[in-house]
């Protein structure tokens, strides 16, 4: 079965370098749910083995689903992982449509860590028109904007507010930043869960 891989690095808000140095270490955890008792989420991870993460009482769950270019509409808040083109535009590798409650997350234009020279643009869709090589989208953010070409082979994903009831055994989940506490335990306030064939990373 075809699986859609959802990458999330650099889609979240950046933290100032000085403040980051003072923060406790974090761990990225991705895998399948083994169990969830309402507080402790047990995950089987290929990279980390069996991991248990304590979820905070207000932990948010976001469902990640496959979307289409038709969902990329003016006003939508998106994140675009792309490669720069010779004409100054960005050719999208992956587009993420954020839930409305996530509007403003990671806003701006910066390097992406998915592959060498790749970029990340988070902002609001200002306009979208059909182009020769794909849909041409203007993404506006505070202080600037980027012209993005979304080719037919770009991965397009959508985030929606989910519920802890989705954290069932076998569900594919990803925690981008699980806080590693002094006693070695992990704690998180957000979980991404794949819907359909999407596998969050």
Language model feature labels by segment:
Residues 4, 17-201:
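Short, flexible, surface-exposed loop segments at domain boundaries
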Residues 6-16:
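Bacterial N-terminal signal peptides
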